[in-house]
């Protein structure tokens, strides 16, 4: 039985998610930024529904998270997804933005960081995202570090992703996670992946090939009293991947151009991502869809394995 507080004033559960948590079924949280900021309407709605479908196909219940009317939506209905997808100007809400958006009663599209806040409050132990934020290149001067990394240290949620984007300093990102004692497990891969690229060039601290062992490892982390996330990475399918050296060359050139144009801070990431998309002639669109689907599917599989573990140990 779930220990979730279904009467929490800041949470609005869908009936399906509420029933799943109450009866101990596996649930996977999903962000809503992909709906409000990822693709144009109606492609954004179709993509969100496709992501939910692959979670269901693995035997888990999807819980897409948004913010509306002063509460987190824990499990968005088709009507919710349609409304968010068709509405222009919904702000992207990271962890720091949550209090103000909730207080004002507005809408917000959740990022990795804010989705983890909501998932942890709701008692959902798994979250899927195509890729996480990290330490930006030049962070030793700019101090530009994604809130995702900080939130990992605060939220008791397993995060399934295809690593971090190549535009980041992936070496420093891994160093930060090590310093914060956030476990990194690469599923059926030796290397830490880099979103569009199967390998970042950095080895993963741990490789595990069995979903049951991954599930046990996650639970062991929490049984040790840790309140932090566990990061599970899985690389993009080989047929959809983009060569690491090609991407690195594009990023270096684009970063120099961005510096020349005075583009920094929040504007740097979309600038670099657009540069990669242009230079690869849109191959990043296919790659992005690939990792959205594959990470959601793996999260569903691992959530089921984790539920099986809890049931075997009478903890579900």
UniProtKB/Swiss-Prot annotation:
Entry GO CC: cytoplasm
EC number(s) reported in the record: 4.2.1.70
Catalytic activity of the protein: D-ribose 5-phosphate + uracil = psi-UMP + H2O
Cofactor: Mn(2+)
Active-site residues annotated for this sequence: 31, 165
Cofactor stoichiometry and binding remark: Binds 1 Mn(2+) ion per subunit.
Molecular function in Gene Ontology: hydrolase activity, acting on glycosyl bonds; metal ion binding; pseudouridylate synthase activity
Alphabetical list of Pfam families matching this protein: Indigoidine_A
Keyword Isomerase annotated: no
A GO BP annotation: nucleobase catabolic process
Subunit structure comment from the entry: Homotrimer.
Family, as annotated: Belongs to the pseudouridine-5'-phosphate glycosidase family.
Protein name listed in UniProt: Pseudouridine-5'-phosphate glycosidase
């Amino acid at each position: 039985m779930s220990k979730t507080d279904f009467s929490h004033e800041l949470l609005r559960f869908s009936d399906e998610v509420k029933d799943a948590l109450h009866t101990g079924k596996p649930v996977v949280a999903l962000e809503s930024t992909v709906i409000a900021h990822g693709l144009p309407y109606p492609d954004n709605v179709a993509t969100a529904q496709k992501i939910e479908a692959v979670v269901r196909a693995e035997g888990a219940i999807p819980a897409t998270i948004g913010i509306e009317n002063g509460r987190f939506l824990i499990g968005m209905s088709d009507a919710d997804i349609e409304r968010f997808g068709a509405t222009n100007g919904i702000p992207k809400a990271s962890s720091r933005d949550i209090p103000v958006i909730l207080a004002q009663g507005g809408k917000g599209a959740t990022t990795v960081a804010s989705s983890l806040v909501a998932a942890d409050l709701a008692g959902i132990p798994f979250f899927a995202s195509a890729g996480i934020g990290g330490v930006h290149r030049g962070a030793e001067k700019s101090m530009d570090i994604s809130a995702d990394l900080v939130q990992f240290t605060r939220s008791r949620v397993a995060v399934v992703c295809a690593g971090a984007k190549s535009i980041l300093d992936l070496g420093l990102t891994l160093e930060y996670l090590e310093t914060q004692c956030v476990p990194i497990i690469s599923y059926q891969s030796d290397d830490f992946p880099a979103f569009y690229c199967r390998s970042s060039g950095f080895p993963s601290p741990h490789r595990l090939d069995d979903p049951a062992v991954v599930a046990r490892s996650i639970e062991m982390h929490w049984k040790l009293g840790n309140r932090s996330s566990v990061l599970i990475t899985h690389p993009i399918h080989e047929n959809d991947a983009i060569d690491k050296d090609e991407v690195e060359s594009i990023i270096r050139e684009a970063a120099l151009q961005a510096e020349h144009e005075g583009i920094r801070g929040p504007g740097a990431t979309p600038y670099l991502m657009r540069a990669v998309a242009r230079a690869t002639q849109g191959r990043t669109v296919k790659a992005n869809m690939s990792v959205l689907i594959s990470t959601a599917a793996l999260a569903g599989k691992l959530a089921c394995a984790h539920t099986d573990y809890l049931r075997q140990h009478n903890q579900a």
